[in-house]
Amino acid sequence: MRKIIFKGNLLTKYKGKKNIRLVLEKRIKSEENLWYWDSHYAIDEMARTNRTKMSLAAGCTSAVSPLTKWDDNIEMAEQKIVTGHCKHTDAFNKKADAVLVSGGSDDVIWDILNGNKIQNFYMNLMYPNDKRYVTVDRHAISIVLGRTATKKENSLTDKQYEFFADCYREVA
């Protein structure tokens, strides 16, 4: 699919990929673009410190990630692992609870997370080099659009998610 009607506006892959490349060029110049590797090691350290499997720590982190800044996300996930509680919505707390008692297989955690963004975020945290998984969050949406996404635009159908993810895959 080369184009999509997104929230009433035509969006082409050409424009989306162009916007991704503009941001990527700026990031490459300013840093080494290793965010997921840094995050992978942070999750691994959290897991070791709290004597749990990395997959459980990554799954819990992913479960409580929606609408959360990264520093708060890590803190909430660790709080959840240590105390069984964190400040997030009931739905995401329940997902984190289910992850933490799941045994830690990727397939089971994937099914528990059951949402494009948090499933892909989990896989990116676990396997930073695997290009099959793309976390399309509000920041990624804004980059493709070339502007800050509205609250309405931050909610994606499965078809829209794949369109945005494909834009990133084709640039990578």
Residue ranges, per PLM feature:
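HhH-family (HhH-GPD) DNA N-glycosylase catalytic core used in base-excision repair
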Residues: M1-A172
